[in-house]
């Protein structure tokens, strides 16, 4: 994944954009998950995350359907994953297919993409946010808040 320059760099309010290599595991899984959600009639899917003190992760996954239609979070979807094996003194990485519930696949995707875009987000004071699949737009958006402790030193002599 690489950061792409925004189209209007003078506008500081415009969010950063990232380009995911479509052949990568994240790129493939994004396509698969969006297609699965669209086929089920979903409007959005959201994975919310929170963490601090060197730990954290996805807390909740929800899918918004039109007119409160049901959505089966336990339905299976085939996605890709990287598997590492230590052989002959070095790590060997392969890409494998795996079947997961849609809920777990969304959770795993969110965990992975947050680590890529906001590496170390859970350290120190941490952060929180949402990974939102917009099925109508065909996009995935991350809304992230970083937490930090601030101090303002002032010295006054009277």
What are these regions (language model features)?
Residues 9, 44-46, 104, 109:
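Residue-level detector of intrinsically disordered, flexible termini
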Residues 1-44:
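Long, hydrophobic N-terminal alpha-helical segment
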Residues 74-124:
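Short, hydrophobic/π-rich interface segment
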Residues 37-41, 101-105, 134-140:
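A short, structured loop/turn motif at beta-sheet edges
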Residues 28-88:
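Short, well-structured hydrophobic secondary-structure segments
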Residues 122, 127-158:
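Acidic, proline/glycine-rich low-complexity IDRs
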Residues 17-28, 68-71, 97, 101-108:
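Alpha-helix boundary/N-cap detector
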